[in-house]
Amino acid sequence: MDRFAATVERHWLAWLLAMMLIVTGLPFLSPVLMALGWTNAGTFIYTLYTPFCHQLPQRSWFLFGEKLTYTLDEINRVYPSSDPWQLRFFYGTQAMGWKVAWSDRMLSFYTMTPVFGLLYAALGRGRLRPLPWRLFLLALLPMALDGATHILSDLIFGVSNGGFRDTNVWLALLTGNAFPAFYAGDHFGTFNWYARLFTGLLAAWGVAFFAFPWLDQLQRRRDA
């Protein structure tokens, strides 16, 4: 037992990243299980991750179907609801495919944090210092702003009533409506889709290159 504990302590980053990759990768198994007809197992994973993600289908990726993402109008044709709580229980259909148990923002943030951790390990753990805390907070800020404005818009207008983060009229005005198909909605290719993807990536980079070097330094002090 002592030998095992010593091994874990010596290779703590490898163990931590392995566990993180399993935990963050498990939501990709839910659409696989649903497609195989193992609906109880797939539904269990969706339920397991509900506390960590809203799982709104119009803001999620679908696998094994016609498209990667669907608009709320497309979803409402087979699942007529505008209630956010009810919408999270739409997992997909054989034709549409099955959604990943992460929303697009959480998919980007949660999944890429251990991936950036692997990059940190590959670049040489001992040589890299933690990001300055101001830069770390700056990396989190875009995702926080994006998420907070979506929450505010959804609370005021609902998820289907043309809120300011659904239409993004403000962005169309700022850019002279140069890209008409880019502004409204949450589906692939829209501003919201890219904003969630890239702010999640930036936050994941910040967390990985702040937390993992800091934990490494802490471990070295303990070993000294």
Predicted regions and their residues:
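Small-polar-interrupted transmembrane alpha-helices in polytopic inner-membrane proteins
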Residues: 19-27, 112-116, 131-154
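Extracytosolic (periplasmic/ER-lumenal) interhelical loops and adjacent juxtamembrane/interface segments
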Residues: 35-102, 159-188
